[in-house]
């Protein structure tokens, strides 16, 4: 890669909804812009997506690469996704080494190993596709996990709904 044409430290960018509310923000310790392909490399990026109906989701990594048109962000190395508990839904976390994000379409995907936790459930897979608009999750291969559904009284049930 050639030298960057500009560098920004403590970088922050925000995307707003039509009503003026914040849709998502991207912050990074450092951003380097490369004119040869109009991409940007981010050091310690964090993207936070704001959705009043689903709660905020944050993505962190050691590095990120923003595409030339700004439509995608590739998070690399020690990728962590977190959605705090929201509206009765338990915390959700995801860890992987690479995550491709299309913020304006609410899409994320990877072809790498992932570990996904949702409350007391844990699933591991190789590859994942997630559409946050439709809440559809596709685990691509080698899926293994333990799913625990909450009982009506709020206690976690044993896997597959067996009584304890």
Predicted regions and their residues:
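Mature-chain termini and adjacent capping regions
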Residues: 1-164
């Amino acid at each position: 890669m050639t030298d960057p044409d500009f560098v920004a430290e403590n970088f922050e960018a925000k995307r707003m909804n039509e009503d003026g509310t914040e849709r998502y923000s991207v912050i990074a310790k450092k951003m380097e812009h490369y004119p040869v392909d109009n991409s940007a490399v981010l050091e310690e990026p964090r993207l936070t997506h704001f959705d009043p109906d689903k709660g905020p989701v944050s993505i962190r990594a050691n590095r990120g690469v923003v595409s030339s048109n700004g439509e995608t962000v590739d998070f690399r190395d020690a990728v962590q996704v977190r959605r705090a508990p929201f509206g009765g839904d338990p915390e959700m976390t995801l860890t992987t080494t690479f995550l491709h994000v299309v913020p304006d379409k609410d899409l994320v995907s990877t072809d790498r190993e992932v570990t996904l936790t949702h409350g007391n459930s844990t699933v591991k897979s190789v590859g994942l596709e997630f559409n946050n608009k439709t809440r559809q999750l596709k685990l691509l291969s080698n899926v293994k996990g333990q799913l625990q559904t909450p009982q009506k009284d709020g206690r976690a049930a044993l896997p597959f709904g067996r009584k304890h």
